[in-house]
Design a protein with these regions (language model features):
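A structural signal for short beta-strand/turn segments enriched in small hydrophobics and glycine
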Residues: 149, 157-160, 256, 264-267
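Internal alpha-helical transmembrane segments
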Residues: 69, 73-80, 84-145, 236, ...
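Residue-level signature of transmembrane alpha-helical entry/exit and packing/kink sites
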Residues: 2, 6-10, 98-107, 387-391
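Alpha-helical transmembrane segments of multi-pass membrane proteins
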Residues: 14-18, 72, 114, 118, ...
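Functional transmembrane alpha-helices
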Residues: 89-98, 212-266, 273-401, 416-439, ...
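Interdomain regulatory linker/hinge segments that flank or connect interaction modules
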Residues: 82-123, 163-211, 352
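Small-residue-rich helix-interface/hinge motifs
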Residues: 2-86, 402-424
C-alpha cells in the first residue's frame, strides 16, 4: 500500500505538470496558427496507447509509456522523426513556415508555463499557510552536530550567530542552499569564544548520501520516551520497492522493547554517562553496535536499569519526546505572498543550475541524479497536502530548468538551433536537425537508464 501511495502521488504530480507543460506549447502554437496534430500524456511508443479521441484536427490521448508527454506540431522535427512529412513542401500552417521568433516562443511555451505554475504553487502555499521557522536566537542549547558537521570543525552546543556576516534569524537558513551550495562562512559562539568556520562548497556531495541532520540540527533536550518500537505483523513487511528489486528481507529487531523500556520512561544515563541531550544519547548508543549497554531510566519516580542489546545499525528502537525549540509563524496577505512565492521558485531554479554546475566540475556526484523511483520516495508513503504541492512546485521548476538545457530533443536544444538561425539569418539544415535529434534522443535514454540505475543501486544500499 505504501508503494502505491508513493506511485500515485508521483503519477498525479508529474501528470499535472506534463499536461501543463505541453499545454504551453499547444497554446503558443495555436496562437500563431500552427497546426497541432497530437496532444498526449505519456508516450504512445510504437503506436500503443491506453486511449485517444479526436476533436477538430487534434488527437488527444494517453500513451502507455509514463516518461513524460508531447504535442506533435506539424512541420517540426521532433521525437516522432516524421521525415516523410518534412520531405513535402512547407505549408503555411506548419511550424517550419513561421518566423523564427514565433517558433522560439512556441518552444519556450512549456518552460514558461512550468515557471508560472511553480510561482503560483509557492504563492498560494505562502498565502494559505504562511511560513514557520525555528527562532535561531532562542536556541540557547545551540546545535546538534552530525559527522559531516564535525568534519568542518563544528561541535555540539555551538551557536550559529551569522552567515556570511548577516545575522541568522531563521535556523532553517543554516541548512539552506545559501550555505550548502555556496560555501558560506559561519560565525559561531562556542562558550565565550567567537569563531569563524567555512563550509566547503563540496559539502553537498557528502550530504547527498545522508540527510541534513548529519550536518547540523537544533539541539534537543530529552524529556521522556514517546515511542518504543514493538513487533507489528502488518508493519513488519518487506517494502514495495524492495520486493520489486529483490532486495533480501531482514526482519526488524526491537532491543528497547525486549529489554522492557516503556513509553513515559525518562532516560537519565547510558553506561553511567549522563545524557541530557538527544545527541549525547544517540552517540553513546551508536558507539556500541551489537553490544550490550546499561540504560538508567526514571519510571514513576523510581530509577530502573535496563540491559539493552544494541542493534547492528546502532539503534535500540525508541523515539523520545523532545523539548522543542521556539518556532515563529508569519502570515502573508494575498499580494505580498506573490514576491515570496516568486523568490522561492527562482531559488529552486538557481539551485538546479548550481547542482548541474557542481556535477560538471566534479563537486557533486552524478549519483544524485534520480529517476521517478527516487522522486516517488521523496513524495513519501502518506499523503500530505502541503508536502505534495511543495514537491510538485519544486519539480515544476526543475522541469523548467531541465527542459532549458541545450540538449537536442529537449526544448533547450530546439531553442539553441533557433537562436543560431536568428544570428546567421538562415535556418539550420533539416539533415543537421534530424541527426541532432537522434543524438539527443540517445543522450536522454542514457541519462534515463543512468538515473534508474542510481535508484536501483540505492535500494540495495550501494
Amino acid at each position: 500500500m505504501n508503494g502505491l501511495i508513493m506511485a500515485g502521488q508521483l503519477l498525479l504530480g508529474l501528470s499535472l505538470l506534463v499536461i501543463l507543460h505541453e499545454l504551453g506549447h499547444f497554446l503558443a502554437a495555436r496562437a500563431f496558427g500552427i497546426k497541432v496534430e497530437k496532444f498526449y500524456l505519456f508516450f504512445d511508443a510504437w503506436g500503443f496507447k491506453l486511449f485517444s479521441f479526436k476533436k477538430g484536427d487534434v488527437e488527444y490521448g494517453v500513451g502507455w509509456l509514463p516518461l513524460g508527454g508531447y504535442v506533435k506540431i506539424a512541420g517540426m522535427i521532433d521525437e516522432s522523426m516524421d521525415t516523410e512529412q518534412m520531405a513535402q513542401p512547407a505549408q503555411p500552417w506548419e511550424f517550419r513556415s513561421k518566423p523564427a521568433w514565433q517558433r522560439l516562443i512556441v518552444m519556450l511555451g512549456g518552460i514558461i508555463v512550468n515557471v508560472i505554475v511553480g510561482i503560483i504553487i509557492f504563492w498560494m502555499l505562502t498565502f494559505k499557510y504562511g511560513q514557520n521557522y525555528t527562532v535561531n536566537g532562542k536556541l540557547t542549547d545551540g546545535i546538534s552536530v552530525g559527522n559531516i558537521g564535525k568534519e568542518i570543525g563544528l561541535k555540539n552546543g555551538d551557536r550559529i550567530l551569522a552567515i556570511n556576516g548577516s545575522k541568522l534569524i531563521k535556523f532553517e537558513d543554516a541548512i539552506s542552499s545559501k550555505v550548502l551550495f555556496d560555501g558560506a562562512q559561519l560565525t559561531i559562539l562556542r562558550g565565550n569564544q567567537t569563531l569563524y568556520i567555512s563550509v566547503p562548497d563540496t559539502i553537498l556531495n557528502k550530504l547527498s548520501k545522508n540527510d541534513k541532520e548529519n550536518f547540523i540540527a537544533p539541539r534537543y533536550r530529552m524529556a521522556s520516551v514517546a515511542t518504543v518500537l514493538a513487533p507489528d505483523e502488518k508493519a513488519d513487511q518487506q517494502s514495495f520497492f524492495d520486493k520489486i528489486f529483490g532486495r533480501p528481507y531482514v526482519k526488524p529487531v526491537y532491543p528497547a522493547y525486549a529489554a522492557g523500556i516503556k513509553p513515559g520512561d525518562s532516560i537519565l544515563a547510558v553506561n553511567g554517562k549522563s545524557v541530557t541531550f538527544f545527541d549525547q544519547f544517540k552517540e553513546e548508543v551508536s558507539q556500541n553496535k551489537n553490544k550490550q549497554i546499561t540504560i538508567n531510566a526514571l519510571r514513576k519516580g523510581k530509577e530502573i536499569n535496563f540491559d539493552v542489546l544494541v542493534g547492528k545499525e546502532g539503534t535500540i528502537g525508541i523515539a523520545p519526546n523532545f523539548k522543542m525549540p521556539e518556532t515563529a509563524h508569519v502570515e502573508f496577505g494575498f499580494a505580498e505572498s506573490l514576491p515570496i512565492g516568486a523568490t522561492m521558485a527562482w531559488s529552486t531554479f538557481l539551485d538546479n543550475a548550481k547542482g548541474i554546475g557542481k556535477m560538471i566540475t566534479g563537486k557533486l556526484s552524478a549519483r544524485n541524479i534520480s529517476s521517478p523511483i527516487g522522486i516517488a520516495k521523496v513524495y513519501g508513503s502518506t499523503f500530505d497536502w502541503v508536502k505534495f504541492w511543495t514537491l510538485t512546485g519544486l519539480i515544476s521548476m526543475a522541469l523548467a530548468f531541465m527542459n532549458l538545457l541545450p540538449i537536442p530533443g529537449l526544448d533547450g536544444g530546439h531553442v539553441v538551433f533557433l537562436l543560431i538561425e536568428m544570428v546567421q539569418r538562415k535556418p539550420v539544415s533539416e539533415k543537421v536537425l534530424e541527426k541532432a535529434q537522434i543524438v539527443g534522443f540517445v543522450i536522454l535514454i542514457c541519462l534515463m537508464v543512468f538515473a534508474f540505475g542510481n535508484d536501483i543501486l540505492k535500494s540495495f544500499g550501494k
